[in-house]
Amino acid sequence: MKIVVSGGGTGGHIYPALAFIHEVKKQHPNVDVLYIGTKKGLESTIVPRENIPFHAIDISGLKRSLSFENVKTIVRFIKSVRACKKLLKQYKPDVVLGTGGYVCGPVVYAAAKLGIPTIIHEQNSIPGLTNTFLSRYANKVAICFEETKQYFPQEKVVLTGNPRASEVVGKDGREARRSLGLDEKKKTVLIVGGSRGARPINEAFLQVLHEVEQKPYQCLYVTGDVHYDKVMKAVNDVGNPSNVIIRPFIHNMPEVLAGVDVIVARAGATTLAEITALGIPSILIPSPYVTNNHQEKNARALEKKGAAIVRLESELTGVRLLDDIDRILLNEQTLTNMKEAAFQLGIRDAAERLYRVMVEMIS
């Protein structure tokens, strides 16, 4: 079996693609995989580290306003489609999967025009430009939120969930807690702003850091590499509570997630897939700097089911954040209800579901 996978720009498109590849390799150890991305995207470093053959194409995204850059982008798209057709004819894949980001546009489009079975995977509740365009040509559209159905041709849609969810299931959080110096008997809240951190979340938590010492729970506070030095200077000025562990970055996040009771985070699709798979209640602060405000839409889907509290960045304060944490962690019934609501939303076999969609298409 040969498959081509394409998706990139951000981890939200790359990690679901990698989780899918891991599942296919588990089912078919001898599968041939080719990953197509860009030289500038994160995929150019992440994918080769996984020992997956990588091919880069020259393509950029469309601007949402009228721009001469868009003319150049369309020209590059046409050239990339030609290059992809040539590559696909040589490689002869059985199926092509696109997981979003502008790079998968010419790849999936070229495959569809060549009659190769194609799937696109949409992680967010509101689709991006690339997947909206590709849904006209792809054979199947895999989604993660029921609400997303309305944006795609109904006969093509299948609810699979985010394959990344499957990679956090079954992890043991005890070793991660021990290695971080966390008390195994205390409830734990993880505060994290994504791989680069989030300044507004850092600022809010620092406002109430001195009050956390009195709390019966503990905090694992992940600042993000770029904010760490500034945060530690502020912490040293007020004193670091004994029940707050501060780290710049967490490399073993699946294991860490398995050991926490509540998470304070952005509302990226991968994060939500992971925390619902594990049934972790959340306080979500959607990033306002994303296309279509999709993080707030993602977060509201969890809030609607009672799995999350949503705080917009504009209304976030330290006092409000600490009150929200207390509201969940200091009330056993609230904690239990939110855990159950989150767990019910989780799709733990997402990678296998997407794999089955692929198998049904090519068999």
From Swiss-Prot:
Q: Which InterPro entries does this entry report, sorted A to Z? A: GlcNAc_MurG, Glyco_trans_28_C, GlycoTrans_28_N
Keyword Glycosyltransferase (UniProt): yes
> What pathway does this protein act in?
Cell wall biogenesis; peptidoglycan biosynthesis
Q: Which Gene3D superfamilies match?
A: Glycogen Phosphorylase B
Gene coding for it: murG
Q: Which organism is it from?
A: Anoxybacillus flavithermus (strain DSM 21510 / WK1)
Pfam families per UniProt: Glyco_tran_28_C (PF04101), Glyco_transf_28 (PF03033)
Q: How does it sit in the membrane?
A: Peripheral membrane protein
What is known about what this protein does?
Cell wall formation. Catalyzes the transfer of a GlcNAc subunit on undecaprenyl-pyrophosphoryl-MurNAc-pentapeptide (lipid intermediate I) to form undecaprenyl-pyrophosphoryl-MurNAc-(pentapeptide)GlcNAc (lipid intermediate II).
Q: Which GO terms describe its biological process?
A: carbohydrate metabolic process; cell division; cell wall organization; lipid glycosylation; peptidoglycan biosynthetic process; regulation of cell shape
According to UniProt, the name of this protein is UDP-N-acetylglucosamine--N-acetylmuramyl-(pentapeptide) pyrophosphoryl-undecaprenol N-acetylglucosamine transferase
Q: What class of enzyme is it?
A: transferase
